[in-house]
Regions:
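Surface/interface-facing alpha-helical segments and adjacent flexible terminal/loop regions used
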Residues: 2-239
Length: 239
């Protein structure tokens, strides 16, 4: 995979103090966990009901809390997402808008799947935009990671283990358990998993649709936030 550059430092605008997952306070830990959980939800695809937090922009709160620490590109990314939210009148309207974009980008379109949600599809591409087969080495490695932690996918999940949302749920597990148990090994794995495993393929995933999708920018923007969060975690230095 192509080398993905991690930013050298993440500085607190109020004090120029380096931030990393090792130094986050409880409030920012909670915001990061909530942000990762929300991103996982988005890439599963939204349900027909229960989207009032998106309609009202409430879901942006953890991302707003993380902005001084993570840094987003473009900097006004949250304002653009907020503008999308306010352009709809009810939950059904915003659901239809996002569902159509989700299917068009990640499931099927006239010209095929624009950006598959599986890490295996971005390994050993023979040509730009060409997908590698499903259930490749990334899927096998994710299965091994789950087994090594005594985890398993629920019976209701019928996706390969390298689906983006599943990888985000695994990252959530590493962070939450690493912080709550004070487990240095899990925190270290969260850093390497975000920066070395997830970020390279998620950047390729983002590149697939960033210049193509013009009708709905929601997933362009949330994927930009995801990349920023992965860079932040992956660049964390041990104290």
């Amino acid at each position: 995979m192509d080398e993905v550059r991690l930013s050298d430092t993440h500085l607190n605008r109020q004090g120029d103090r380096m931030h990393s997952i090792y130094s986050l306070d409880k409030t920012n830990q909670a915001a990061l966990l909530e942000g990762v959980a929300l991103l996982s939800r988005f890439y599963w695809g939204l349900a027909a009901e229960g989207n009032r937090d998106i309609l009202q922009g409430i879901y942006l709160r953890p991302f707003e809390a993380l902005k001084p620490i993570v840094g987003y590109e473009p900097p006004d990314i949250l304002d653009e997402l907020r503008a999308i939210n306010t352009s709809f009148l009810d939950e059904d309207e915003i659901f239809q808008y996002l569902e159509q974009a989700y299917v068009r980008l990640f499931i099927n379109s006239r010209d095929g799947i624009t950006a598959p949600l599986y890490a295996s599809c971005y390994v050993a591409e023979s040509a730009p935009g060409e997908n590698a087969p499903l259930m490749g080495p990334p899927a096998a490695l994710m299965k091994e990671r789950f087994q090594s932690k005594g985890l398993s996918l629920g019976d209701h999940i019928h996706e390969p283990p390298d689906h983006l949302s599943i990888e985000l749920e695994y990252l959530y597990f590493l962070l939450e358990r690493g912080w709550s148990d004070g487990d240095a090994a899990l925190k270290d794995e969260a850093v390497s998993f975000a920066g070395q495993i997830m970020l390279p393929w998620v950047v390729r995933f983002q590149e697939r649709f960033v210049a193509i999708e013009t009708e709905c920018r929601f997933y362009q923007l949330t994927t930009a936030i995801l990349c920023a969060i992965l860079r932040f975690i992956g660049a964390s230095d041990k104290p």
